[in-house]
Amino acid sequence: MACLKLQAVTKSYDGVTPVIKQIDLDVADGEFIVMVGPSGCGKSTLLRMVAGLERTTTGDIYIGDQRVTDLEPKDRGIAMVFQNYVLYPHMNVFDNMAYGLKIRGFGKEQIRQRVDEAARILELQPLLKRKPRELSGGQRQRVAMGRAIVREPAVFLFDEPLSNLDAKLRVQMRLELQQLHRRLKTTSLYVTHDQVEAMTLAQRVIVMNKGVAEQIGTPSEVYKRPASLFVASFIGSPAMNLLDGTVSPDGRTFILSDGLTLPLEIPQPQWGGRRLTLGIRPEHIQQTTSAQGVPMNLLTLELLGADNLAHGLWGGQSIIARLSHEEMPVAGSTLHLYLPPAALHFFDTDSGLRIEP
């Protein structure tokens, strides 16, 4: 095992347009880090630079105490698991897992021991003689992981390994990945576009946007204290409600575009007259009496089973409130909503950055 360090790493293909803007990252020995973001945000490019499949434009990459920036992938002590399983169809499970060791000159007994141990960890012992066509998607992905495990790498790199699996199997494989990491305690860098994978697997999350690491933190930090409008809108399902408006001169109300005012129970006079974006998560909005709440005309109600989502508009801007499964107001009715002051987030509308009271 080893730590992973990225030092002022950047990437540009034409020398002008940055694909990855400067990123510094320290991954502790045994830590599981997940990079999450939309397509084209640079997360896979960054992973490929760590793997040695892409060259950095500037900066250095260290695995343990060794600078690996200019080393070939085979010399970096890494193992990758891809979205596609890349199994040899004519080989059985044992030979697929053993192949990388064979071409590196390992002895038969050493290969057998490593494959048997990986198969035990992944519960693949009964499948070692089967061909890939005889396996389910989840079993094939476990074989791909086994092929990485037998290398005993310093760092695991995962490139969207669950994307080809159906929803039920993804849940199962997420649990298996968590258990696998607890057993092996190998430093891991994992890429996904799925925020559920990021939040459930990661010890720390890197939220990527247009080549920038918008926020690096624990899943709880990223969810509870998003550093920017992008993070607030990307992490969470449904996303955080974001309302553009202006703080009143006395700092006691937040005024939306149509003149609707939202009370600020904790006045913010330092922001008086300033254009801001107010954020609140759907689950933090509460139903209350008409005297205490802000009215919202219910446009539609989504019934999700465990809870319900009430959709409406405030000042021409969408608002979603998460209700209990027992609350089933009728479309067209008026809800009165309360915004707890401790649940409010504020962002500078122009820069998109979080601001603190």
Swiss-Prot record:
Biological process (GO), any one: glycerophosphodiester transmembrane transport
Membrane topology listed for this record: Peripheral membrane protein
InterPro entries: AAA+_ATPase, ABC_transporter-like_ATP-bd, ABC_transporter-like_CS, ABC_transpr_MalK-like, ABC_transpr_MalK/UgpC-like, Mo/tungstate-bd_C_term_dom, NA-bd_OB-fold, OB_MalK-like
Main location: membrane
UniProt xrefs under Pfam families: ABC_tran, OB_MalK
SUPFAM superfamilies the UniProt entry points to: MOP-like, P-loop containing nucleoside triphosphate hydrolases
Catalytic reaction list: sn-glycerol 3-phosphate(out) + ATP + H2O = sn-glycerol 3-phosphate(in) + ADP + phosphate + H(+)
Gene3D superfamilies: 2.40.50.100, Nucleic acid-binding proteins (2.40.50.140), P-loop containing nucleotide triphosphate hydrolases (3.40.50.300)
Domain ABC transporter per the UniProt entry, residue ranges: 4-235
Keyword Transport in annotation: yes
Annotated Gene Ontology cellular component terms: ATP-binding cassette (ABC) transporter complex, substrate-binding subunit-containing
Binding site for ATP: G37, P38, S39, G40, C41, G42, K43, S44
Keywords, in A-Z order: ATP-binding, Cell inner membrane, Cell membrane, Membrane, Nucleotide-binding, Sugar transport, Translocase, Transport
Subunit structure: The complex is composed of two ATP-binding proteins (UgpC), two transmembrane proteins (UgpA and UgpE) and a solute-binding protein (UgpB).
Family: Belongs to the ABC transporter superfamily. sn-glycerol-3-phosphate importer (TC 3.A.1.1.3) family.
Function: Part of the ABC transporter complex UgpBAEC involved in sn-glycerol-3-phosphate (G3P) import. Responsible for energy coupling to the transport system.
Name of this protein: sn-glycerol-3-phosphate import ATP-binding protein UgpC
Organism, scientific name: Yersinia pestis
